[in-house]
Amino acid sequence: MSDIERLEQEICLALEMAGDEQALEAVRIAALGKKGSISEKLKALGKMSASERQKVGPVLNGLKNRVLELWTQKRDFLRRQAMDACLTRETVDITLPVRSSPIERGRIHPISQVIEEIIAIYMKMGFSLAEGPDIETDYYNFTALNFPEGHPAREMHDTFFFDVNKTGERKLLRTHTSPVQIRTMEKQKAPIRIIIPGKTYRMDSDATHSPMFHQVEGLVIDKTSTIAHMMWLHETFCKAFFEVSSVKMRFRPSFFPFTEPSMEVDIQCDRSGSEVKFGEGQDWLEILGCGMVHPHVLKNVGLDPDEYQGFAWGMGIDRIAMLKYGMPDLRAFFDADLRWLDHYGFRCFDMHAFFPGLRNV
């Protein structure tokens, strides 16, 4: 056995015996450091004849490369071993036993479920999600949206106003999520395609109204969008949300300060039985309001209405949740009654998809 072969065996044995990175580094230095065994032999090549260098040089370089490869493999092995030991030592079991009683299991609230369904449908159509503050200024909630000074929505009996602050400004709880449309158009260049789900507040309370309710609005701004695009969008949404293959819709003229022309949309349904069935029947049910964005609104955010156009719409999330899942009283949504939630809520671990209420999305 030659000296080089014997040296390789010694180094390989030392690498195998190294139990930690510190010992492994010592082996590397002993073999490949400035005064290491392999380094010394490489230095000795200069004293050899040309023929000897041609013979011994490749052998030594091959040994050096093999030792480096073995050293790297052992280092990676030791690091993985140390990480596994650390994870085993620091593991904390955060699981809990499954509760046996059905009423004790957590439920996803129908409002949360419906919001996720709405987001899933619109995001599949290329929309992004936008959010804004619940506490708004008069400008963003009314003025920028073309509400005139004497509009009833500006009155104390319809809107929750805060006291006038030191600067003379009176803030309010937003009455719709439309202020987010203004904020988005101020910050983002066209084209814009957003949906805005969120809480809104109005002084109203009965079986179908609540002082706090959930609303989703949408906005499309570009240079080519028309009423035809808006009608197709609403039809596509209703078919996906109510899980029907076809649906008839009726667009009725209406008035909203921030759109012109404005429309209210009815969807054909059957209300003859105990539940509402969509895609059939001879009844009509109002589902949302919409229209082309008013030129004054575009001007308020610095857009030229001769160049840009678009449409906006809004619908009550609580209302369409009641329609889809057969809930008779809106007030029960906010009573924190576990019996109601056990009946109408969604079990997290019984779901077969991220959005189980949508078979067609």
Curated annotation (Swiss-Prot):
GO MF annotation terms: ATP binding; magnesium ion binding; phenylalanine-tRNA ligase activity; tRNA binding
Catalytic activity: tRNA(Phe) + L-phenylalanine + ATP = L-phenylalanyl-tRNA(Phe) + AMP + diphosphate + H(+)
BP terms from Gene Ontology: phenylalanyl-tRNA aminoacylation
Cofactor note: Binds 2 magnesium ions per tetramer.
Keywords: Aminoacyl-tRNA synthetase, ATP-binding, Cytoplasm, Ligase, Magnesium, Metal-binding, Nucleotide-binding, Protein biosynthesis
Family: Belongs to the class-II aminoacyl-tRNA synthetase family. Phe-tRNA synthetase alpha subunit type 1 subfamily.
PANTHER family cross-referenced by the UniProt entry: PHENYLALANINE--TRNA LIGASE, MITOCHONDRIAL, PHENYLALANYL-TRNA SYNTHETASE
Assembly information from the UniProt record: Tetramer of two alpha and two beta subunits.
Protein name: Phenylalanine--tRNA ligase alpha subunit
Source species: Bartonella henselae (strain ATCC 49882 / DSM 28221 / CCUG 30454 / Houston 1) (Rochalimaea henselae)
